[in-house]
């Protein structure tokens, strides 16, 4: 019913998604479906994994939606081992996520180094599809399959690994409850 262009662009020295345009295009797509005579009973949002946004106490976005293709995560894996004693073998055993330099944990640690003020101001962490859901229905939640790509979710518990999050000095309270795919949000 509806298609639109999407890509990353350089903002504030980083490769970023135009998240506001993406959100607007989702709404335009829903309007196009309605205009074509379709009335969806439900909406599911599927995007690339690993990318996220932070929101403040008023639900406003903090900073840019930096894309996984950005170079900010260079060397972060090595820094986790050097500075936190977190070997890749231990990390993998906890989360079951293979090493990809763009996994969310490395993005968060790069953000912690570059913009600690953003993490300090954050009240919510939402993966990109979770953020789009939040804009549509006002419910903040982290969907499990996408959250698992953060390398911060326990492979056994299928929930946030609180000890790992604390070890890395990330604010635990920003992570929303994890919901399974297909959970009705609003």
Question: What is each model feature region?
Answer:
Residues 73, 86, 97-101:
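Gly/Ser-rich phosphate-binding catalytic loop and adjacent alpha/beta segment
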Residues 70:
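Carbohydrate-associated surface elements
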Residues 10-13, 75-79, 152-154:
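Short, charged, surface-exposed secondary-structure boundary motifs
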Residues 91-186:
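Gly/Ser/Thr-rich active-site cleft segment
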Residues 38, 86, 169-170:
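Helix N-cap/coil-helix junction residues
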Residues 75, 86-87, 117-119:
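Short helix-loop capping/hinge motifs at secondary-structure junctions, enriched
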Residues 1-64, 93, 121, 176-177:
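N-terminal glycine/serine-rich phosphate-binding loop of ATP-dependent small-molecule kinases
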Residues 57-61, 79, 83, 90:
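Hydrophobic or amphipathic alpha-helical targeting/insertion segments
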């Amino acid at each position: 019913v509806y298609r639109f262009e999407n890509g990353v662009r350089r903002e504030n020295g980083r490769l970023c998604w135009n998240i506001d345009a993406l959100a607007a295009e989702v709404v335009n797509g829903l309007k196009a479906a309605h205009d074509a005579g379709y009335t969806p009973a439900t909406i599911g949002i599927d995007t690339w994994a690993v990318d996220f946004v932070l929101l403040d106490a008023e639900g406003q976005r903090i900073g840019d939606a930096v894309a996984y293709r950005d170079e900010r995560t260079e060397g972060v894996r090595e820094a986790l081992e050097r500075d936190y004693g977190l070997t890749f073998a231990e990390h993998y055993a906890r989360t079951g996520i293979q090493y990809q330099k763009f996994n969310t944990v490395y993005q968060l640690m790069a953000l912690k180094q570059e913009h600690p003020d953003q993490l300090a101001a954050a009240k919510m962490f939402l993966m990109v599809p979770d953020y789009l859901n939040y804009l549509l229905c006002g419910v903040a939640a982290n969907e499990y399959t996408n959250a698992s790509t953060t390398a911060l979710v326990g492979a056994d518990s299928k929930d946030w690994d609180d000890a790992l999050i604390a070890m890395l000095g990330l604010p635990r309270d920003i992570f929303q409850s994890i919901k399974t795919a297909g959970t009705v949000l609003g």
